[in-house]
From Swiss-Prot:
The gene is OPG085. Keywords: Hydrolase, Late protein, Metal-binding, Metalloprotease, Protease, Virion, Zinc. Probably involved in maturation of some viral proteins by processing them preferentially at Ala-Gly-|-Ser/Thr/Lys motifs. Does not seem to be responsible for the cleavage of major core proteins. Its main location: virion. Disulfide bonds: none annotated. One of its GO terms (biological process) is viral life cycle. Its cofactor is Zn(2+). This is Metalloendopeptidase OPG085. GO terms for cellular component: virion component. It comes from Variola virus. It is found in: Virion. Its EC number is 3.4.24.-. Undergoes proteolytic processing during the course of infection. May be cleaved into 46 kDa and 22 kDa products (Potential).
Amino acid sequence: MIVLPNKVRIFINDRMKKDIYLGISNFGFENDIDEILGIAHLLEHLLISFDSTIFLANASTSRSYMSFWCKSINSATESDAIRTLVSWFFSNGKLKDNFSLSSIRFHIKELENEYYFRNEVFHCMDILTFLSGGDLYNGGRIDMIDNLNIVRDMLVNRMQRISGSNIVIFVKRLGPGTLDFFNQTFGSLPACPEIIPSSIPVSTNGKIVMTPSPFYTVMVKINPTLDNILGILYLYETYHLIDYETIGNQLYLTVSFIDETEYESFLRGEAILQISQCQRINMNYSDDYMMNIYLNFPWLSHDLYDYITRINDDSKSILISLTNEIYTSIINRDIIVIYPNFSKAMCNTRDTQQHPIVVLDATNDGLIKKPYRSIPLMKRLTSNEIFIRYGDASLMDMITLSLSKQDISLKRNAEGIRVKHSFSADDIQAIMESDSFLKYSRSKPAAMYQYIFLSFFASGNSIDDILTNRDSTLEFSKKTKSKILFGRNARYDVTTKSSFVCGIVRGKLLDKTSLVEMMWDLKKKGLIYSMEFTNLLSKNTFYLFTFTIYTDEVYDYLNTNKLFPAKCLVISTKGDVENFSSLKKDVVIRV
């Protein structure tokens, strides 16, 4: 670890795929409480800008921090990626503090599309922020556009809170002149912020939250000590369904169950977690997980690898102490209990977006203060990989699981999805068959539409056949290479339970790079949040799908795009009754 005079921390991580990865602690949307919810997320969207033909890049805003990364591709170099990321924050050697109203307006439209996307695919339920005075979704809404001047002032104010002590930088390599460049830019920031934000309200403990969830989850408040953090690292590397959450200076260990009986037994204090010592902790975490640790606990004074001896040599005492603290919090009701509930009729009037949630007090009724049984946990395997064809009945359940677990990766091709995970076959089956997970998987049907229309365009099956078997999506006919013929009509309107644009496009020069560039252009115009592409077996032919509330504008953009003169697009309007009648004509597509 390299520490600059103003306390910026720099780490060299040669295993990282990114060229540069930067995080800012105490800079997430928990700072929006008592201001305008969404300022942090809007700032993230305003800052990031790059040439998608020579860079891969992204940014994210969480409850307590913001992070940005950039990777060079094609003709760009690692140094180019570093300078590009730094340019998001500095202009002519000075920290950016000026944002045009037109740019703010476009990005607010983009935020509304992101809200729509996330609300269609996920359940946006940030329980901790909600209990602390925020909303269940805090990423910003379209009504921010009514206060553009106030929003701009808040953005400038937020930039002035950045300080050296909040900055963490990972670089793949520290090339010649890179350290000097960091000194001249991030090293020029004050060690402490120019504007000190007000303290974040303390979240309420002792609550039961009934809301959509794939698991029965308990958030247990523990002290944010070094030993407890090492204990969390130990548990995270060893077991599934264990993680942590922070808000302000508070730390919660999250434990999820698939069995309601074990969950209730844990809550009553009659059972403890069965934590066994493994052979050795290697700290082989992803760069995302490592960055999260440094940002959530900015007081850590050493490289995490400096603690590898301590976490292995003292694991027994660390885990005993953590287990005792967990049990004490259960008995004292220093917990937040998340109980899966999928009723569409319930909502909390404090949530301005009217998401389904009910909050109750966690009482001491039925507490047993002498545990007499232990609950086994799901152990992690080193690695596992499966391939699921689009016709497999478990496809949507696996997609749902990957969306609810960050350590599961999906890679999609024309025939199916490749899934990398670290579960055993028995544990995967137990999750897939659990009542709460099945209800959760079925509670957001919008994600299914992406695969319904992919099946329609990539196979010879009729829309009627596909809809009849939508729970399993249909097997794609991939034994022979499909020849796709485009008809005269480029637009087909349908009614579904969601609003989106999808279809197939073909062009002689069409490739993934040009489509990614197109996606970023649509994002800058505020018309979409993201777009998915699948390369079909027919030459220069892609299937694309995007959720959007601006369907006509997106269609007009795609219809006039010279990249793909051949196109067949489906525009879905959201309605209570599905109507696919426009797709029942043979002129749509022939395979």
